[in-house]
Amino acid sequence: MKTRIKTKLALAATLLSFNVFAAGDLHLDHANTDISDTASLQNGAKLFMNYCSGCHAIGFMRYNRIAQDLNLSDSLVAEHLMFAGEKPGETITTAMPKEGAAKWFGGTPPDLSLVARAKGTDWIYTYLRGFYEDDSKVFGVNNKVLENASMPDVLWSLKEGKSEAEFDQDVRDITNFLDYVGEPAKLIRTSLGVWVLLFLGVLFILTYLLKKEYWKDVKYGIWRPRD
């Protein structure tokens, strides 16, 4: 019960952490993520930890859960995802102090555990690619999705030496990873769902044939009510 309450509160906090935008006036690019693409999730995890985790936590996720779900060895997790002596069973937090965040950004950067469930993958994908130069802002950039965002364009260095398509794929991988973080069980649920539907399909056929067999006797008078 407490876990459900915490999840709902975190989801509400994520929603309130972002400014409201007019969806009708904004075109969101399709992320086209695939949570079954393990290579994409692995790259997304690496990029998130290198470019995003300095400010944003994903407190509902643990390092060893990522290792288990994404088929990563403990050594790879330690090398690419853990930078401050964290333990595998710890949740993924940020080292940024709240006081510093409030001073530098005007508020504490939100935990992104549930951002994909709150905003959707298309929103994340478009937002991360939506920064443009604006000299009137503190960080020299603005964002077409979230106007007056207090976040700098942290992925600008990721563009260096890459084509637009390659950069878009990196952003897609980060988005894919955040989609996984929002609901890790989706990895099992989506694959299991296919088998459940197949089972229900076979069960429907067998039930229909059984119904025909029973009602055949009724139809041809083998079963008749007594007078």
PLM features per residue range, with description:
Residues 1-11:
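Bacterial N-terminal signal peptides that target proteins for export
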Residues 17-19:
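N-terminal signal peptide c-region/cleavage motif recognized by signal peptidases
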Residues 23-46, 57-68, 77, 182-190:
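Electrostatic cytochrome c docking/interface patches
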Residues 39, 43, 47, 119, ...:
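Extracytoplasmic/secreted proteins, especially bacterial periplasmic and envelope-associated proteins
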Residues 48-59, 174:
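The canonical Cys-X-X-Cys-His
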Residues 71-144, 149-167, 227:
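Electron-transfer interface patches adjacent to heme c in soluble/periplasmic c-type cytochromes
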Residues 160-196:
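Short, aromatic-rich amphipathic segments at membrane interfaces
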Residues 189-192, 201-227:
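Juxtamembrane interface at the cytosolic side of transmembrane helices
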